[in-house]
């Protein structure tokens, strides 16, 4: 029997990428159009919400048209419309939500609301089918979370950052090093050229929880650089980057594998913008091997680690099957989060 073809038009506009995708049956990308705003925000050293919103207004219709054309489909072929409604920048989110609602209304299509962070996790569906229970390490500019999924569509935060997210720490360190925004890719490159000579702190590494903290590392890094400036000492940029990244990766890997062992999960999904970091990818793979864990490590391709509409379509396919739909009064929720589970 031929599988029924479900085509979802998916919108992502939570931060500084406008993306529209057409996804078939939750696992095949027919189109994934992304309009990035990085150059517009680089001179500010970070994302300016008002600038981001204006760019989304300019790009959302163009991206929608291009996504449909690349996929070779029309509105009449669609099964549903999906959209990120949080977390993110409220003005940016509203552009995508408004566009999705307008199309759903005009073409009498179901509207599927998607948590942006769930989208990052479900990007792994483009690599292989997910098996539950699984553990996801979510690392981005705004989040550093360990998420336990006992089943499809069920998310429980078991570890979170107490202060800065990992990606946020990378960008702040990048400003100190004089690296253009976004700094993660360049710091990762420099780290592979240097050595861990500064031995920066590994916060909360030995504490009996799965939470993270990167503010102490950030402060130690900044103080080291400022002290060197005051005494006229020149520090090796590659060694600084390597020392910073070694601290971040060791903490992320240690806590993640500790959780995976406790929960006896089948798969470990690495998701979010920082999932593109080669140091983190290498560290997790090496950690799993050295610990002798029977754990399937799933990492989306680099092009799907950042914000994109395809991941929203993958998540929406699950939500649609579970009849998780929204009315036309759907609104943006900038602080949207998963439920918390404090004890393993």
From Swiss-Prot:
A GO cellular component annotated for this chain's UniProt record is: cytoplasm
Signal peptide (residue range) = none
Q: Which GO terms describe its molecular function?
A: iron ion binding; N(6)-L-threonylcarbamoyladenine synthase activity
Q: Which Gene3D superfamilies match?
A: 3.30.420.40
Listed under catalytic activity are: L-threonylcarbamoyladenylate + adenosine(37) in tRNA = N(6)-L-threonylcarbamoyladenosine(37) in tRNA + AMP + H(+)
Q: Which cofactor does it need?
A: Fe(2+)
Give the location in the cell.
Cytoplasm
Q: Which residues bind Fe cation?
A: 116, 120, 307
Binding note for cofactor: Binds 1 Fe(2+) ion per subunit.
Where is substrate bound in this sequence?
A: 138-142, 171, 184, 188, 277
Q: Does the keyword Nuclease apply?
A: no
* Keyword entries, A-Z: Acyltransferase, Cytoplasm, Iron, Metal-binding, Transferase, tRNA processing
This molecule's function is given as: Required for the formation of a threonylcarbamoyl group on adenosine at position 37 (t(6)A37) in tRNAs that read codons beginning with adenine. Is involved in the transfer of the threonylcarbamoyl moiety of threonylcarbamoyl-AMP (TC-AMP) to the N6 group of A37, together with TsaE and TsaB. TsaD likely plays a direct catalytic role in this reaction.
This protein's name = tRNA N6-adenosine threonylcarbamoyltransferase
Q: Which organism is it from?
A: Latilactobacillus sakei subsp. sakei (strain 23K) (Lactobacillus sakei subsp. sakei)
> Which gene carries the instructions for this protein?
tsaD
